[in-house]
Amino acid sequence: MKDISFSVVIPAYNASESIITTLDCLNEQSYKNFDVIIVDDKSADAQKLAEVVSSERYSGLKINLVLSETKLNGAGARNRGIDLATGDYVCFLDADDEWHKDKLQQNLSLIERLEGQGDRRFIIYSQVNIIQDGSFLKVMPLKPVGEHESIAEYLFGCYGFIQTSTIVLKREDAAEIRFDERYIRHQDYDLCIRADKLGFKFVMIAQPLANYHMVTRFGSQHKGESVKYSLFWLDAMKPHLTRRDVYTYKAYKLPLRYKMDGKSLQASLSFARYFFLTNKDNRNDFLKRLMNKLRTRLTGK
C-alpha cells in the first residue's frame, strides 16, 4: 500500500497565541507525511500569526499560510483549505485545539484497514477530551453511532458527538461535500448530516485523540448560539432531516439555547414536548445520567 499523505486544514481567527500549542502538537506527530494549510480569516493579528508560523520553531512543518483579505467565517476558511489540499486525506484542526501525538498514525492504521476491506466512502472521527475553561470536563462521545441511527439523531442526542478537530476523510470527498458557508454555527453538524444522506460510513476511534477547548465566559451570542440562529439553522436543514431528527434537536439541543438566552420555561416546555418522540437509546441515556446526578447529590459521592 502506498504511503498515505494528509493535509491538515486549520481555520484561524485572532489565533496567533492559541495556535502555538496547536502547531506544537503537529510538530510532535509520530506520522510525518502531512502538510498544514492555515487559513486566516481576516484577523486583526494576521501579521503576528505570520511571524509565529514562519518562526524556527515550526521550520520542520510544511505550512501553507493563507491570509484572507475578505471575511470567510469558519465554513469558508475550511473550504479554502480543502481547495488547497494536496494530501490523500483531509483532516480538520481548530486553531485552539490539540491532537494526541499518535493521532495521524492511528488514523492511518484505520484507513489501511478500511481500504483493505473495500470501504470507499467513510468519515473517521474519534473521542475527544473536552476542556472547559482550562479544566478537564469529560470524554465524548460516549459511544459510536448506532446501526439504525441517523447521524442527526446521534449528534443531537445525549451521547453522540463528532468534533471537527477529529474529522478525517478523503480529499475528493471533502471537495464534494464541503461546508455550507451560510452557517456561522453547526457547520460540522451540516457536513456530517449531508454525508450520512450520501451513504458515508462513520467510523469512531474509541480513544480521545484530541483536546477540544470550550470557553463559557462569553454569552451565547458570541458564536451564533442563540435560539433565533438555532431555529434558522434547523429550518434550513429540514430537507436533510427526518421528523425524528427534528424532534431530537428540539428535545436536547434547543433547550440548551433557551437556557443560554435566559428562557428557562421555554427550555422546559421544548424538552417536555419532544423528549418521548426521540429514540429509546437517547431517552435511556438521559434518564441514566439524571439518576446518576440525583444519586450524587443525595450521597455526596
UniProtKB/Swiss-Prot annotation:
Similarity annotation: Belongs to the glycosyltransferase 2 family.
Q: Does the keyword Glycosyltransferase apply?
A: yes
Keywords, A to Z?
Exopolysaccharide synthesis, Glycosyltransferase, Transferase, Virulence
Q: Which PANTHER family match?
A: GLYCOSYLTRANSFERASE, GLYCOSYLTRANSFERASE 2-LIKE DOMAIN-CONTAINING PROTEIN
Cross-referenced InterPro entries: Glyco_trans_2-like, Glycosyltransf_2, Nucleotide-diphossugar_trans
Gene coding for it = amsB
Entry function: Involved in the biosynthesis of amylovoran, which functions as a virulence factor. May function as a glycosyl transferase which transfers galactose from UDP-galactose to a lipid-linked amylovoran-subunit precursor.
- Please state what the protein is called: Amylovoran biosynthesis glycosyltransferase AmsB
User: Which species is this record about?
Assistant: Erwinia amylovora
Pathway(s) annotated for this protein in UniProt: Glycan metabolism; exopolysaccharide biosynthesis
- Cite a single GO MF annotation: glycosyltransferase activity
* Highest classification ranks of the organism: Bacteria, Pseudomonadati, Pseudomonadota, Gammaproteobacteria, Enterobacterales
In short, the EC number is: 2.4.-.-
Keyword flag Transferase? yes
Q: Give an example GO biological process.
A: polysaccharide biosynthetic process
